[in-house]
Amino acid sequence: MLERIKVCFTESIQTQIAAAEALPDAISRAAMTLVHSLLNGNKILCCGNGTSAANAQHFAASMINRFETERPSLPAIALNTDNVVLTAIANDRLHDEVYAKQVRALGHAGDVLLAISTRGNSRDIVKAVEAAVTRDMTIVALTGYDGGELAGLLGPQDVEIRIPSHHSARIQEMHMLTVNCLCDLIDNTLFLHQDD
């Protein structure tokens, strides 16, 4: 058992090192995409399933409340938090539409959809991205594996942050770290005006 614990930590560290080498440009582009949207008076819609839903909710909470520094609230909505809306849509046998319907109702040109999917193939996340495209929204996608179907939907203005791993737990860990990086960069850019 002790050896297995060491393996888990080692795999996580190795994934972090690989991500630290591969992802800074994509994370920086994503942060600037989010910052520009916020500066233009727009909002961020976030979605994911399971652990990805928790990461989406963490991002929205960090925008609305704060990340590490007291500052004004920023407009972000986690689309996975309203159980009444989710179950009403799913009850009509439209589970694949649980996020897309919300994107069509709440999303506007200039808004950003933060779509989080470990494999990039979750039908409801794919449909949300398709809906965001019809609303002239920009997409920031956090993925893993080969990016899945989600990666193929992204345009030149969109940003994919693909964790260099084929292990779901490591990808989800890195998604949380990436969300924290995005929150830090947004706060740093909008309120601290430091460029490290």
Curated annotation (Swiss-Prot):
Flavoprotein is among the record's keywords: no
The SIS domain, residue ranges: 34-196
Entries under PROSITE patterns matching the protein: SIS
GO MF term list: carbohydrate derivative binding
InterPro entries xrefs: DiaA, GmhA/DiaA, SIS_dom, SIS_dom_sf, SIS_GmhA/DiaA_subfam
Gene3D superfamilies noted in UniProt: Glucose-6-phosphate isomerase like protein, domain 1
Keyword annotations of the record: DNA replication
A Pfam family reported for this protein in Swiss-Prot or TrEMBL: SIS_2
GO biological process: carbohydrate derivative metabolic process; DNA replication
Annotated family: Belongs to the SIS family. DiaA subfamily.
Quaternary data: Homotetramer; dimer of dimers.
HAMAP family on file: SIS_DiaA (MF_01157)
Purpose of the protein: Required for the timely initiation of chromosomal replication via direct interactions with the DnaA initiator protein.
Protein name per its UniProtKB record: DnaA initiator-associating protein DiaA
Gene for this chain: diaA
